[in-house]
Amino acid sequence: MTMKSIATYAALAIIGAAVDGLTSMAIPTGPAASHIQPVAFGVPLPQDPAPAADVPTAAELTSLLNKIVDPDVSFMHKSQLVEGGIGSAEAHIGDRELKNAAQKGELPLLFSVTNIRPGTSGSATADVSVSGPKLNPPVTQNITFINKGSWVLSRHSAMELLQAAGR
């Protein structure tokens, strides 16, 4: 045997002894070890949480609603915010209603979005409370949003909001 081989075997023996010593230190022995009792048998491990559903955040929906009711931006430039777009007649009526609301002191409107849930494929619903200077108590409606690459207000919900605003 060469000196190199002897040194290698000696190093392996030292490492093996060290590992054996660590292993024996990690396994409790004696009277304390026999007092450890399992408390549950056959209990399943917790499952991973279900993947998050494809729903927008409250901040995303609030931002969308704020853009829709911004009186300084024409409804012609809000077409991408509503499912199917906004026609020119609808845009004209929407602009007039928002300008009137601003002149009457009914703006700004504040939105509180809660209870966001996945809907049918590519949609989500949320409870939206609207408050403003002349909306006391706030009005709450369940609104549907559609995912078209970004979240937009469903056409049906847009019409309901316009009707509610006209009351």
UniProtKB/Swiss-Prot annotation:
Residues 1-21 form the signal peptide. One of its GO terms (cellular component) is extracellular region. Its main location: secreted. It is found in: Secreted. Keywords: Secreted, Signal. It comes from the Bacteria. Belongs to the MTB12 family. This is Low molecular weight antigen MTB12 homolog. It comes from Mycobacterium leprae (strain TN). The gene is mtb12.
